[in-house]
Amino acid sequence: MKATGVVRRIDDLGRVVIPKEIRKTLRIKEGEPLEIFTDREGQVILKKYSPIGELSEFATGYAETLSKTTGHIACITDKDTVIAISGGPKKEFLEQNVSDELEQLMEDKEIYTSKENSDVAVPITKNDNNERKYNAQVVYPIISNGDTIGTVILLSKESNTKMNEVEKKVAQSAASFLGSQMEI
């Protein structure tokens, strides 16, 4: 007999309580949308909904364009993972969980730029120990319907590079465009 996990009853309104341990493990916050699926065996499947994840192919193309245009590494994330990268190591970033620092920037809807080479770059993924490998960085939140749904990030490894207004505006344009695509 296979393990059944946690057993819960459905209340009068059709609600099921997801245990705190599972929510913490899967990083599901209060009010966060979930997709509900059923399979042929009658199982109900809950999946975290990522609005920008639906645009992952489009986001990949957009990241490639950003990278070619700016000459920098371009990343696009949803709230949980890196969904597109161009100009940098895909293995290191793609489908990796975002760092707590980046998650906090998203929560605060904060625009971050490492202005000087002495400024510390925000780690992108949880595995990113950020041993000074990025000398310049712009992080711009993707906002749709007033909520942050991800980020556009430009990175540079070159020691004499500084992100200026042009890079900020490019990241802002990309974030605004992706956010508006989700509102359609």
Give the location of each predicted region.
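Short beta-strand-centered segments at strand-helix junctions
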Residues: G14-L26
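Short hydrophobic alpha-helical segments used for membrane anchoring or interfacial signaling
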Residues: I73-S86
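Juxtadomain coupling helices with adjacent low-complexity linkers
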Residues: S56-T65, V98-E103, G150-I184
